Amino acid sequence: MKKIAVLISGQGTNLQTIIDACHSGDIPAKIACVISNKADAYGLVRAKQAQIPQAVFLRKNFSNNLEMDDAIGDYLQSLAVDLIVLAGYMKILTPKFTQRFAGKILNIHPSLLPKYAGLNTYQRAIEAGDNEHGTTVHFVNEEVDGGAIVLQAKVPIFPEDSIEEVEARTREQEYQIYPLVIKWFTEGRLRLKDNLAYLDGKALPKSGYANE
C-alpha cells in the first residue's frame, strides 16, 4: 500500500477529506504522517484523532529555509513516502526540496491556474469582476503554483457574493477533486513526466483533465 505524507499549516479541512477517503478505501493508501509548520494547527488534532503520526517543524528552530526543508525531506525519506500532499501548507518549498521529490508532490490552489497564483485569490477574482472562480490540483515544481495542472473545478461568482461565499463554494469542490487526484496517483494512474501530467498513459492538456 502506498504511503502519503500530508503537510498542513492550519485547520486541516482538506486533510480531513483525505483521512476519510483513506479510511473508506476510496484512496488505496495509508497516511504515514501529518507535518505542520505551525504548532497550534488544528489539523494536528485531526491527525491525532485518526491515530496518524504528527510532526512539527518550526522555522525558528532552523537557521534558514533550506535547512528546514532538508530536515523535513530527511524525515519523509525515512518513512519512504510515495506521495507528499500539500493541504493548506502556507510556506513556499525550496527548489532543492521540490527537485528532491519531483513528481511526488501535489498541491491544491484556490483559483483556476494560471490565473491568480499566490494569495487572496477570492478577493482578486471578485475585484476583477469575474463571473467564475475555481480550484486547481497540480504537481509542485520550483515555480510557485506553476507545476503541471492535473484537474480543475469551476464555481460561479454571483454579483452580490462575498469573499466568504465564493470561498465556501470553492472549498466544496476542493473536497471532491483532491481525494480523486490522490486516488489516481496512488493507483498508479497519474504521473509526471517532462513537467507534463499523464493520466492512464495519456498526456493531459495544460488546463488539466477537467477541461480536456
UniProtKB/Swiss-Prot annotation:
The keyword Transferase applies. Signal peptide: none annotated. The record marks D145 as: Raises pKa of active site His. (6R)-10-formyltetrahydrofolate binds at M90, K91, I92, L93, N107. Its EC number is 2.1.2.2. Gene3D superfamilies: Formyl transferase, N-terminal domain (3.40.50.170). Pathway: Purine metabolism; IMP biosynthesis via de novo pathway; N(2)-formyl-N(1)-(5-phospho-D-ribosyl)glycinamide from N(1)-(5-phospho-D-ribosyl)glycinamide (10-formyl THF route): step 1/1. InterPro entries: Formyl_transf_N (IPR002376), Formyl_transf_N_sf (IPR036477), GART (IPR004607), GART_AS (IPR001555). One of its GO terms (cellular component) is cytoplasm. It catalyses: N(1)-(5-phospho-beta-D-ribosyl)glycinamide + (6R)-10-formyltetrahydrofolate = N(2)-formyl-N(1)-(5-phospho-beta-D-ribosyl)glycinamide + (6S)-5,6,7,8-tetrahydrofolate + H(+). Keywords: Purine biosynthesis, Transferase. N(1)-(5-phospho-beta-D-ribosyl)glycinamide binds at G12, T13, N14. CDD domains: FMT_core_GART. GO terms for molecular function: phosphoribosylglycinamide formyltransferase activity. It comes from the Bacteria. PROSITE patterns: GART (PS00373). GO terms for biological process: 'de novo' IMP biosynthetic process. The active site is at H109 (proton donor). It is an enzyme of class 2 (transferase). Belongs to the GART family. Catalyzes the transfer of a formyl group from 10-formyltetrahydrofolate to 5-phospho-ribosyl-glycinamide (GAR), producing 5-phospho-ribosyl-N-formylglycinamide (FGAR) and tetrahydrofolate. HAMAP family: PurN. This is Phosphoribosylglycinamide formyltransferase. It comes from Haemophilus influenzae (strain ATCC 51907 / DSM 11121 / KW20 / Rd). The lineage of its organism: Bacteria, Pseudomonadati, Pseudomonadota, Gammaproteobacteria, Pasteurellales.
